[in-house]
């Protein structure tokens, strides 16, 4: 009798690490994108929490007038924010080691740049991780495509807009009131409400909410009865069951009679594609709008576009919005400018006769 002994090569440490990283059996999938996502998002989150609680005031306008944003310096949850990096830094890469001291780094708003850049890397990797997990499971890639809309929006306000305006100080502050301030100033300087891409974004968000509510209520109203009156209707569903849990024909018939026949989907797949695509495309357009307005390709200007036969201006809603824009513009960064940009751009009249 002859025994044949086969020497099995033990898998290398690197091979086991690769298998663990890409395993779909882990409770939470890591993936190669996760290797970068986890440290960047942890860094952004940690610095955000510390800075929101304890960061000293930041000289956002670069004029030696620091603005307080943290809780320990007098703010609450509503008014608090991570103040954007100083206009004195502009678009320069400003890590801690570029400052003369940590105090200088904090005074110039270094935490904002650190948080934003790590956050954008992290959410981009999260999107890649969605694609990676879909690929491993043999799924189609549209989850990552849908997530690209909020990623594009965040990239627009935190990176593209500061690049276009020439300074991270023009980025969106990381806080509730700071976000509202960003929106108001954006309207004042770019007339975003009159930009078609913003209008498409509004239609996408509000339309998506409407369609989500319509779909959820139609499905909930046409569930196939599996329970008694004394049980929750939710008990009639078992995870993984093969049968439909609602009657799409009944839902189609109801909605087709409520509006008209062709307003109602008769294909569940095309319906769900529509529910995903509508808000995603709208938010894509808004991100594109922010990115074009970053370089001052602004919303429509219909100011004083209606005049009577004598040449006198008949005010329209556009003129009311323009007046509001001017009011908002003269109030923001009030000590940084003598005049708002669009008023200072007009040639001054001669004073020497």
UniProtKB/Swiss-Prot annotation:
Gene Ontology process terms (BP): photosynthetic electron transport in photosystem II; response to herbicide
Intracellular or extracellular location(s): Plastid, Chloroplast thylakoid membrane
Catalytic activity line of the entry: 2 a plastoquinone + 4 hnu + 2 H2O = 2 a plastoquinol + O2
Species this chain originates from: Lepidium virginicum
Pfam families: Photo_RC
Annotated site, Stabilizes free radical intermediate, chain positions: 190
Cofactor note: The D1/D2 heterodimer binds P680, chlorophylls that are the primary electron donor of PSII, and subsequent electron acceptors. It shares a non-heme iron and each subunit binds pheophytin, quinone, additional chlorophylls, carotenoids and lipids. D1 provides most of the ligands for the Mn4-Ca-O5 cluster of the oxygen-evolving complex (OEC). There is also a Cl(-1) ion associated with D1 and D2, which is required for oxygen evolution. The PSII complex binds additional chlorophylls, carotenoids and specific lipids.
Function: Photosystem II (PSII) is a light-driven water:plastoquinone oxidoreductase that uses light energy to abstract electrons from H(2)O, generating O(2) and a proton gradient subsequently used for ATP formation. It consists of a core antenna complex that captures photons, and an electron transfer chain that converts photonic excitation into a charge separation. The D1/D2 (PsbA/PsbD) reaction center heterodimer binds P680, the primary electron donor of PSII as well as several subsequent electron acceptors.
Residues engaged in binding Fe cation: 215, 272
Residues with N-acetylthreonine modification: 2
Protein name: Photosystem II protein D1
